[in-house]
Amino acid sequence: MTVITIAKRGLPKLTTSTSSTTTASSSSTITSVVSSSSSSSSLPLLSNSTSSSIIPSITPPSRNGNPYILDSGDMPNGTVFIIVGGIAGVIFLAILLWWVITTYSSHRLTRSVQDYESKMFSAQHTQFYGDSPYMDYPAKENFQDQVHISESDISPGNKDESVKDALVSHTNNEKPFLSNFERPLSSLVSESNRNSLFISPTGDILNKTRLSKLYQESPRLLQKPVIMTSDNVSTNSLVSTISSSSASSLDNGNEKEVGEDIRKPAKIASSPSRKLLNSPESDGSVNRNHSKGNLLVVQSKRKPTPSTYLEHMLEGKEQDE
């Protein structure tokens, strides 16, 4: 440890002398001032000390004969970083490839769905939906666009042949009959309880149950032959098939259920196909057919539900009591 002592230093004293001489006296004065100042001042003494430390050098063990030391003499520098970077790159490429495949498959699926919907909702398929322009056609086209036979146009000799031709055309045109059968029924789903802000949950449930019954009976009804009515008109429309099914079901004791299936949807929906059932001409023809036993339409004895009554009241319809 080095101790540094600091001594107090005094101020130099200046002495002046007056002389009448010239240069010699002035030089002696300067000499005396310098000598007096140097003699009276004392400077501190500084001592320097140095310290040194020994750092040992690390020497790795030799790889010769040591199985626990990897000999990396043949490997390049940064081998570990290269391996880690390669693994990360492979993972990134796998994720990118998965994203490309998923996007492509989703795009193809979307295109196929769009093509399917464009085909299903085209003009030739929209007749099965409630918002179809086919629903705005007159009821005559909905029910009487098939085979029409009248005795005024048929001679007595060709009457049997005309009936056979009508039966053959009825069998061949089974698919158009199915479209005409589904066309008025589709209005029950789209137009029922949708003409006002009031929605009847019970009415929707009843309509769905009636629709399911009618769709279940549709294959059996469409296989029936053409019925010749008393006014010499071939009634192979939906009214004749449903009415004939009601006539056959009366013999089996199902009068009440068939009557509800026929009359209740006609009161709910307001499409042209439903209005045909309530028209005076159809009522007159039904009464004539009822008198001869060809067509029977059973009036429903069940009173309308409160929700249906309110709906008709909001729509301004008169209730039949």
Swiss-Prot record:
Q: Where in the cell is it found?
A: Membrane
> What's a GO cellular component annotated to this UniProt protein?
fungal-type vacuole
Show the InterPro entries listed in the entry: PRM
Here the cross-link named Glycyl lysine isopeptide (Lys-Gly) (interchain with G-Cter in ubiquitin) sits at: K317
Q: Which domain of life is it from?
A: Eukaryota
Q: Which residues carry this modification: Phosphoserine?
A: S132, S282, S285, S291
Q: Where does the UniProt annotation place the signal sequence?
A: none
Q: Tell me how this protein sits in the membrane.
A: Single-pass membrane protein
Q: Where is the composition biased (Low complexity)?
A: 241-250
Q: Which UniProt keywords apply?
A: Isopeptide bond, Membrane, Phosphoprotein, Transmembrane, Transmembrane helix, Ubl conjugation
Q: Ranges of Polar residues compositional bias?
A: 279-288
What are the Basic and acidic residues biased-composition ranges?
253-264, 312-321
Cite the residue spans of the region called Disordered.
35-59, 241-321
Instruction: Indicate the transmembrane segments per the record.
Output: 81-101
The family line of this record is: Belongs to the PRM5 family.
| UniProt name for this protein | Pheromone-regulated membrane protein 5
Q: Which gene encodes it?
A: PRM5
